[in-house]
């Protein structure tokens, strides 16, 4: 871990290397054997595969801040449940067959009476 102290940075950064290898481990060219079967080989040279040079990656990590210094405001995230009264309108249908006091047979349809009733549901 390296410490970077720069005049342009407000506070020092600790640098954590992402990939560190010694130069002996980093090979730019790697020799690969030829994979053709022996009966087809006629003094073919070995194939060379070019592997890109991996760049070293660094991550700049700011130092940990003291959590005791900053006051975290407590916010009440629990909302109080208030009951909302929602009026509902229901239609009540009364079917009344009116019969007159006579000896005649009434073949009319029964009268339909509709009343509006408003109730509050909580």
Swiss-Prot record:
Keyword Glycoprotein listed: yes
This protein's UniProt keywords: Glycoprotein, Milk protein, Phosphoprotein, Secreted
Glycosylation site positions: 84, 86, 89, 95, 102, 118
Tissue: Mammary gland specific. Secreted in milk.
A cellular component term, taken from the record's GO annotations: extracellular space
Subcellular location: Secreted
GO biological process, one term: protein stabilization
Secreted keyword on record: yes
Region of interest (Disordered), ranges: 100-122
InterPro entries: Casein_kappa
Family: Belongs to the kappa-casein family.
Function: Kappa-casein stabilizes micelle formation, preventing casein precipitation in milk.
Name by which UniProt lists this protein: Kappa-casein
Species of provenance: Cervus elaphus
Name of the encoding gene: CSN3
């Amino acid at each position: 871990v390296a410490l970077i102290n720069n005049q342009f940075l407000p506070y020092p950064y600790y640098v954590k290397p992402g990939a560190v290898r010694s130069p002996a481990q980093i090979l730019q060219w790697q020799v690969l054997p030829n994979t053709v079967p022996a009966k087809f080989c006629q003094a073919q040279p070995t194939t060379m595969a070019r592997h890109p040079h991996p760049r070293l990656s660094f991550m700049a990590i700011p130092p940990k801040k003291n959590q005791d210094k900053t006051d975290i405001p407590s916010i009440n995230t629990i909302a109080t449940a208030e009951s909302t009264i929602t009026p509902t309108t229901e239609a009540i249908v009364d079917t009344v067959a009116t019969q007159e006091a006579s000896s005649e047979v009434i073949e009319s349809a029964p009268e339909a009476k509709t009343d509006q009733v408003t109730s509050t549901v909580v």
